[in-house]
């Protein structure tokens, strides 16, 4: 039995034992609704949005979401406390239930903007950013970080960073990608795979800070592994596994909630009302079905299922019948 800690004490509402990581170019509004169908209580996160984009950009495109997505958090990028505070205030007006600051992205573009993983070298600045946002919003302000940058091998430095962050926020929760970020020499993809995982550091953080809600991210590719982590920390955050093999997300949700595991086809058909509503709004099917391609990962007919959706989804007039065509291959 996986314990549920007192979320109210942590300043977080809802169940955070299971969440889906913010992933650039992946966790858009269509992906998040699909994930909500698969896991009704998982915490969902947007793609990272820079604070300036929230303030000056197309807010409907950047911030719009369906009410069914709740609880959903907006992940912000930036390093200027005043701008982050303004963006957080706007986001809360749009209905987001959590604001999360990105302190883990190692891409060159993000580094050039002085935010993301490079902020781990500036814990006082991160604390200022968190405090500025927490002062103007009523929802939790959290941080997603790495263990350190480059060759950092000092647990004490990591723990000090967490102390700074938590001390600045009314929300005692942190999400940790359990590996370092290399700021030179590795692509973002390689940064998710090559730096070694150090789950022991995250476990230690939880042991030393029992009142802190610790959510672990990184390298979780099975329900069994996730459940094992939940014996040591308060939550797990699935990343690529939830996108590339999304049925894992449903299986994990069912394991935590003692709900029956539903067939893949039934879950996909539950998405139909949302898909048809989006199509009526002028969204083309290809923007939606790209998130569905992994649902039959490893299953007979899965490759042809993906081909039908990928090729047919390019048509401007493609509609739900294409999904049914792809399902007919699976169902024989």
Curated annotation (Swiss-Prot):
It holds the Pfam family Dus. The keyword Protein biosynthesis does not apply. Its EC number is 1.3.1.-, 1.3.1.91. Keywords: Flavoprotein, FMN, NADP, Oxidoreductase, RNA-binding, tRNA processing, tRNA-binding. SUPFAM superfamilies: FMN-linked oxidoreductases. Its cofactor is FMN. InterPro entries: Aldolase_TIM, DUS-like_FMN-bd, DUS_fam, DusA, tRNA_hU_synthase_CS. It catalyses: 5,6-dihydrouridine(20) in tRNA + NADP(+) = uridine(20) in tRNA + NADPH + H(+); 5,6-dihydrouridine(20) in tRNA + NAD(+) = uridine(20) in tRNA + NADH + H(+); 5,6-dihydrouridine(20a) in tRNA + NADP(+) = uridine(20a) in tRNA + NADPH + H(+); 5,6-dihydrouridine(20a) in tRNA + NAD(+) = uridine(20a) in tRNA + NADH + H(+). CDD domains: DUS_like_FMN. FMN binds at residues 22-24, 75, 144, 177, 217-219, 239-240. The record marks 102, 189, 192, 303, 306 as: Interacts with tRNA. The active site is at 105 (proton donor). GO terms for molecular function: flavin adenine dinucleotide binding; FMN binding; tRNA binding; tRNA-dihydrouridine20 synthase activity; tRNA-dihydrouridine20a synthase activity. Catalyzes the synthesis of 5,6-dihydrouridine (D), a modified base found in the D-loop of most tRNAs, via the reduction of the C5-C6 double bond in target uridines. Specifically modifies U20 and U20a in tRNAs. HAMAP family: DusA_subfam. Belongs to the Dus family. DusA subfamily. NCBIfam families: PRK11815.1. This is tRNA-dihydrouridine(20/20a) synthase.
């Amino acid at each position: 039995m996986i314990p549920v800690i007192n979320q109210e004490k942590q300043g977080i509402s809802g169940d955070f034992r299971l969440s889906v990581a913010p992933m650039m170019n992946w966790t858009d509004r269509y992906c998040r609704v699909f994930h909500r169908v698969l896991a009704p209580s998982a915490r969902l996160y947007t793609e990272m949005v820079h604070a300036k984009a929230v303030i000056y950009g197309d807010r409907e495109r950047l911030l719009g979401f369906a009410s069914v997505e709740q609880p959903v958090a907006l992940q912000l990028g930036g390093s200027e406390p005043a701008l982050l505070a303004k963006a957080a205030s706007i986001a809360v007006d749009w209905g987001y239930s959590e604001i999360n600051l990105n302190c883990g992205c190692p891409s060159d573009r993000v580094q050039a903007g002085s935010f993301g993983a490079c902020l781990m070298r500036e814990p006082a600045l991160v604390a200022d950013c968190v405090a500025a946002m927490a002062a103007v919003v009523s929802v939790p302000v959290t941080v997603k970080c790495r263990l350190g940058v480059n060759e950092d091998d000092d647990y004490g430095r990591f723990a000090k960073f967490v102390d700074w962050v938590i001390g600045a926020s009314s929300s005692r929760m942190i999400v940790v990608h359990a590996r370092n970020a290399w700021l030179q020499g590795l692509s973002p993809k390689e940064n998710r795979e090559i730096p070694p995982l150090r789950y022991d550091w995250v476990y230690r953080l939880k042991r030393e800070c029992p009142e802190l809600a610790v959510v672990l991210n990184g390298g979780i590719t099975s329900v069994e592994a996730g459940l094992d982590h939940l014996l040591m920390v308060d939550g797990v955050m699935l990343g690529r596994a939830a996108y590339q093999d999304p049925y894992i997300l449903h299986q994990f949700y069912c394991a935590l909630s003692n709900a029956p595991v539903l067939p893949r086809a039934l879950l996909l058909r539950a998405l139909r009302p949302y898909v048809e509503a989006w199509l009526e709004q002028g969204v083309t099917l290809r923007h939606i079905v790209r998130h569905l391609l992994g649902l039959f990962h490893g299953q007979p007919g899965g490759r042809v299922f993906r081909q039908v959706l990928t090729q047919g989804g390019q048509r401007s007039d493609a509609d739900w019948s294409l999904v049914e065509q792809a399902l007919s291959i699976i169902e024989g």
